[in-house]
Amino acid sequence: MVSRRVQALLDQLRAQGIQDEQVLNALAAVPREKFVDEAFEQKAWDNIALPIGQGQTISQPYMVARMTELLELTPQSRVLETGTGSGYQTAILAHLVQHVCSVERIKGLQWQARRRLKNLDLHNVSTRHGDGWQGWQARAPFDAIIVTAAPPEIPTALMTQLDEGGILVLPVGEEHQYLKRVRRRGGEFIIDTVEAVRFVPLVKGELA
């Protein structure tokens, strides 16, 4: 039985077009208030992005659900997340697949996310302090890659780390950003534009 606030959010997400019940169940199972500062706990189940420090944000629940749905995950999917951030999106993925690899360039955020995931008994996640533009070549190929910050163009390294039939979902752009879905078909990459979005930039190379 979910709380009234959680149910209200799920109803809102359905009204916004989220159809995958597995994704909605994962959102209901992950306590979003555990991934925000105490000052924002009362807003944790509002359908808005919230600051998490270091110039980063925890994404709006609609966008978390939309991007996760676009990945077309199965329990066996090998998943890479670029931009661990608070660990909230990571936790959603961990409820849906057997294992998640996640890269974060800001060491402090990586440590906090690892602690939160451990406290929720989510042990099927590997995190790494690194440059998200480069993905995680040692763990490739991946069936699904999700990027939670916006590069100005699609990073080549991430496309090449997709397995055959794999899907990459990410925001792309600077002043004007669009959510893109990239599907690998043999030597080709089929790119679809989904909708206009607004994300923090994906910083290249610079670790913090």
UniProtKB/Swiss-Prot annotation:
Family (UniProt): Belongs to the methyltransferase superfamily. L-isoaspartyl/D-aspartyl protein methyltransferase family.
Main location: cytoplasm
Uppermost EC category: transferase
Name of encoding gene: pcm
UniProt protein name: Protein-L-isoaspartate O-methyltransferase
Residues at the catalytic site: 59
E.C. numbers: 2.1.1.77
The keyword S-adenosyl-L-methionine appears for this protein: yes
Keywords associated with the record: Cytoplasm, Methyltransferase, S-adenosyl-L-methionine, Transferase
Any one GO molecular-function label of the UniProt entry: protein-L-isoaspartate (D-aspartate) O-methyltransferase activity
